[in-house]
Amino acid sequence: MSTVEEDSDTVTVETVNSVTLTQDTEGNLILHCPQNEADEIDSEDSIEPPHKRLCLSSEDDQSIDDSTPCISVVALPLSENDQSFEVTMTATTEVADDEVTEGTVTQIQILQNEQLDEISPLGNEEVSAVSQAWFTTKEDKDSLTNKGHKWKQGMWSKEEIDILMNNIERYLKARGIKDATEIIFEMSKDERKDFYRTIAWGLNRPLFAVYRRVLRMYDDRNHVGKYTPEEIEKLKELRIKHGNDWATIGAALGRSASSVKDRCRLMKDTCNTGKWTEEEEKRLAEVVHELTSTEPGDIVTQGVSWAAVAERVGTRSEKQCRSKWLNYLNWKQSGGTEWTKEDEINLILRIAELDVADENDINWDLLAEGWSSVRSPQWLRSKWWTIKRQIANHKDVSFPVLIKGLKQLHENQKNNPTLLENKSGSGVPNSNTNSSVQHVQIRVARLEDNTAISSSPMAALQIPVQITHVSSADSPATVDSETITLNSGTLQTFEILPSFHLQPTGTPGTYLLQTSSSQGLPLTLTASPTVTLTAAAPASPEQIIVHALSPEHLLNTSDNVTVQCHTPRVIIQTVATEDITSSISQAELTVDSDIQSSDFPEPPDALEADTFPDEIHHPKMTVEPSFNDAHVSKFSDQNSTELMNSVMVRTEEEISDTDLKQEESPSDLASAYVTEGLESPTIEEQVDQTIDDETILIVPSPHGFIQASDVIDTESVLPLTTLTDPILQHHQEESNIIGSSLGSPVSEDSKDVEDLVNCH
């Protein structure tokens, strides 16, 4: 494997052979990527290595295209100290002009949120004076300021919201309360006197700011929607009657006090709507320059009282005046240039160069200075919000990860200019292009322990797949239902699901493969030789291939087996920590040999398995950088025990003892077979975890294959499930799947946009 390390928490995998995850003495997870030493060896010299090979193919011996991306799944034990552990993975496979692009990108980002650990109420006894002060008087504020205290203001970052929600969950759990609204809206001040001070731990904000944030989050009246004309009229009447008694006005309208206050502030009887007239624009410019003592053509973005401006303009609200000036008129008068795609890329790079941990730390005034195509600092920030929205889960990842993802997108576009040309400015796919792009992002969600199914807490798998499919004129369109039989130990296809999870049903051994829609696929694991998947959906070139490995065979066989596939894949192998010595190579990784197959909680005995050897001897092996269709057709019709690939790779790099210091903790394969414990990933309640907790990782990879290399005890390899999405398998000319581009329409000015699946 060859890797490029940008930072300590990111590894971009270029050529994958095998990956090993271990844990050091401090509990940190280490991703070991042995160097591929056989890259330059001609594979033709060693087409038939003397290992027993297991060919993975469908029951009709259907040959799978080289471009088929494959995803391997493995259970990874995490201790209770890893509650903030997050894994984000991104894979992009590109095919243009019927040829596989060699620049296939796989990015693995393993994040340990150290900030959460440092400020956790359980691990930090020192409480910030700021987070324990209400700031009810100016004297309180001045007192803390004179003592050198500083605090954050403005928009809340994702990290701050995560800390706040984590604190609230801990508070509720410690007191046996199910719903936070009981405390916020029903309890008296005496009953909840310690609530806000407790949940403010780790936040460098005054209590009043925390209080207002919590009210906005939990008050449903803040999310009622747009005011109707009838509500506006009633609001005007209530304002005349009750003045600034916002609580009374809000109660009468069924809205929060802050909502009616904001609406009244922007409400004006004489306001025009729609397009501005030339007279209005001229009047706005004159008023702004008059109130700020500036000359026409000067850039004015700060120090403007928009309430005073609106009063002088007379026909527009303060919000309308502010938006018109900052987003258009000031830029037009100062002779600014148009915003281009290069400007968007430059914005990403400039923000990355700032090296800030939070986007709220960005000084937009300095960033916009001297940039002729930037209309105002506020407009530039709005443009940034538009750019980051192209990462579908931008709200769920940290700011540094978001920046790295956007930089990776920039690099992909730079290396593949045709992709940039094929994308329209609005981000809508160009149906005339013959390029197909698949993008998958995977997250790990913890689940509440369900003792009725398993004795160990489980983490379920959720795979949101962002796919835009533009059918060509001759693309097939069938709507027939289909029933697919999955033979254990083989590969089969069924319709791709935008997102799915396994939901236990009332029948033992039966799970419902739930999609985001109302449809579902019943998946039954029984003693019969087959598993039947029924899909009431049209046949599609977008497919998933499932391959199951039984843990029974992993433990009870001693045959040397090299698993070779001509589909790209990665296996992450977990290593028992008590067996890691101070100096160890990959060939010496072992686990406790006392674990027997009986330890598993009723594994399906019908599933055949690929077996991993107690010891594998390595001859001189080679790699062919690319193998053509002739190699595929040569082996595609052979049975399941014959060679499918003509390449072998040997990894020999020693892993230093500093990379492999392990924390003493037990390894229990009995809890590694977790199929029967999978639950809905929508439940993400934090629970006390043990070292036997399971988290499922999915690792997409570029072209390569699995090789059980070096000397690895069979029990150190956990049961696998392989999900392959041969999206480009037989329909490269019939489907066009691309992600969204940076070219999105300019968003409306918004003050509360607090928002990674990179759709490329």
Swiss-Prot record:
One of its GO terms (biological process) is regulation of transcription by RNA polymerase II. Pfam families: DMTF1_N (PF20588), Myb_DNA-binding (PF00249). One of its GO terms (molecular function) is RNA polymerase II cis-regulatory region sequence-specific DNA binding. SMART domains: SANT. Residues 87-170, 459-760 are annotated as: Required for transcriptional activation. Residues 225-263, 339-388 form the Myb-like domain. Keywords: Activator, Cell cycle, DNA-binding, Nucleus, Phosphoprotein, Repeat, Transcription, Transcription regulation, Tumor suppressor. Residues 87-458 are annotated as: Required for DNA-binding. It is found in: Nucleus. Residues 306-329 bind DNA. PROSITE patterns: HTH_MYB, MYB_LIKE. Residues 414-435, 738-760 are annotated as: Disordered. Its main location: nucleus. Expressed at relatively low levels in colonic mucosa, ovary, peripheral leukocytes, prostate and small intestine, and at higher levels in spleen, testis and thymus. Expressed in multiple regions of the brain and CNS including amygdala, caudate, corpus callosum, hippocampus, substantia nigra and subthalamic nucleus. Isoform 1 is the predominant isoform in monocytes, macrophages and neutrophils, isoform 2 is most strongly expressed in peripheral blood leukocytes and quiescent CD34 positive cells, and isoform 3 is expressed at low levels in all hematopoietic cell types. One of its GO terms (cellular component) is nucleoplasm. SUPFAM superfamilies: Homeodomain-like. Residues 176-760 are annotated as: Interaction with CCND1, CCND2 and CCND3. Residues 268-333 form the HTH myb-type domain. Phosphorylated by the cyclin-D2/CDK4, cyclin-D3/CDK4 and cyclin-D2/CDK6 complexes and to a lesser extent by the cyclin-D1/CDK4 complex. Residues 1-237 are annotated as: Interaction with CCND2. Interacts with the D-type cyclins CCND1, CCND2 and CCND3. Interaction with D-type cyclins may modulate transcriptional activation by this protein. Transcriptional activator which activates the CDKN2A/ARF locus in response to Ras-Raf signaling, thereby promoting p53/TP53-dependent growth arrest. Binds to the consensus sequence 5'-CCCG[GT]ATGT-3'. Isoform 1 may cooperate with MYB to activate transcription of the ANPEP gene. Isoform 2 may antagonize transcriptional activation by isoform 1. Belongs to the DMTF1 family. This is Cyclin-D-binding Myb-like transcription factor 1. It comes from Homo sapiens.
